[in-house]
From Swiss-Prot:
One Pfam family cited in the UniProt record for this chain: FAD_binding_3
Family: Belongs to the paxM FAD-dependent monooxygenase family.
Organism: Aspergillus terreus (strain NIH 2624 / FGSC A1156)
Induction of the gene: Expression is positively regulated by the cluster-specific transcription factor pytR.
GO molecular function (one): FAD binding
Protein name: FAD-dependent monooxygenase pytG
Pathway where it operates: Secondary metabolite biosynthesis
Glycosylation sites: 303
Length: 333
């Protein structure tokens, strides 16, 4: 066996995101040999927060992760829905455990990712810098598959699982092998997103713990989700300029704290010390992210590829958390 060939495994998982790591963690518990091939050379924190529903937590308990996550997450007790300053009502999550066996929990995404990484076996099974170029042996009935990277490394396996996200290399390779032609059905909705994470909001009381907000302003949206220590994970949505037709641009591109506060800074928010978003969400300085992304269904997908390499200095003040990034929203026709 050459130095560029990994030992044979039963399953090769392409992608070390949440899906790939979760599958790896289950395979590890079952004693099934596997490897996870990740294109990124260095794993860095991505995303702001994530909410975990009861069906997800049931699976995580099977992996032995539930107690760790519960201790480091915040229970979601309710979401207050506002139209400008008027409260339309509250979505009560208090019965989730009674009905489904678990509460809904919110946790920092990178922390959740780290727990899954360790549960899957960490560096012992996750191969970084694996830019998959091709999969050979798809025509073989005996299941002998070879996953080959752009730099010539390869792994022999019985099963290949594509867990590599919306721009899936696995899907493209399989489509070509089946003679399918790609079709671009993506359309830009004209909505762009940003997300981030605040520092602990010390002025909030214990009654505020676990309460989220959907703020429906006339020309934009801001949703805030409770996390541990009264920190808030937030998502903002804003319309692009009327003449903006390209999903490759963003109204947040090159944004500074002034740009963001021009959209949300003076808006009403119940957690604001003076009733405004800027007061409720002020945090440590944050670098600006110039990239955006696109998806092939109605959802939001992050792109923080420029975060690690950005030379831009942090702005002096912003109501964001330690980092924030931008999205575009697209849909499939």
């Amino acid at each position: 066996m050459s130095a560029t060939t990994l030992p044979n495994v039963s399953v090769a998982i392409i992608g070390a995101g949440i899906g790939g790591l979760t599958l790896g963690a289950f395979l590890r518990r079952l004693g099934i040999p596997f490897v996870i091939l990740e294109r990124t050379a260095v794993l860095t924190p991505l995303g702001a927060g994530i909410s975990l529903a009861p069906n997800c937590l049931a699976a995580l308990e099977q992996l032995g992760l539930y107690e760790t996550i519960r201790q480091n997450a915040q229970e979601l007790r309710g979401i207050n829905v506002y139209r400008e300053k008027r409260c339309w009502g509250t979505i009560d999550f208090g019965l989730a455990k009674q009905w489904f066996g678990y509460n809904v929990l919110s946790i920092e995404r990178y922390e959740f990712h780290r727990y899954l990484y360790e549960a899957a076996g960490g560096a012992g099974v996750v191969q970084l810098g694996w830019d998959v170029a091709r999969i050979e042996g798809l025509e073989n009935a005996d299941g002998d598959l070879r996953v080959i990277s752009a730099d010539g490394r390869e792994v022999h396996t019985d099963i290949v699982v594509g867990a590599d996200g919306i721009r899936s290399v696995t899907r493209r390779i399989l489509s070509r092998s089946m003679g399918l032609q790609p079709e671009n059905t993506i359309r830009f909705t004209g909505r762009v997103h940003m997300s981030g994470y605040t520092k602990p909001l010390s002025h909030l009381s214990t009654t505020d713990l676990g309460i989220g907000h959907w703020m429906l302003y006339n020309d934009c949206i801001l949703t805030t989700w409770p996390c541990k220590e009264n920190r808030q994970w937030f998502i903002g949505v804003k319309a692009a300029p009327p003449d903006e037709k390209s999903p490759d641009r963003s109204v947040w591109k090159g944004a500074t704290s002034d740009t963001v506060n021009a959209v949300y800074g003076s808006r009403f928010h119940p957690f604001g010390e003076d009733g405004t978003v800027e007061a409720s969400m002020y945090a440590i300085p944050a670098p600006a992210i110039a990239g955006n992304s696109r998806d092939d269904k109605l959802s939001i997908i992050p792109n923080a590829s420029s975060l690690a390499t950005s030379s831009r200095k942090p702005t002096s003040r912003t109501w964001f958390g330690a980092e924030w990034r931008s999205w575009v929203m697209v849909y499939r026709t």
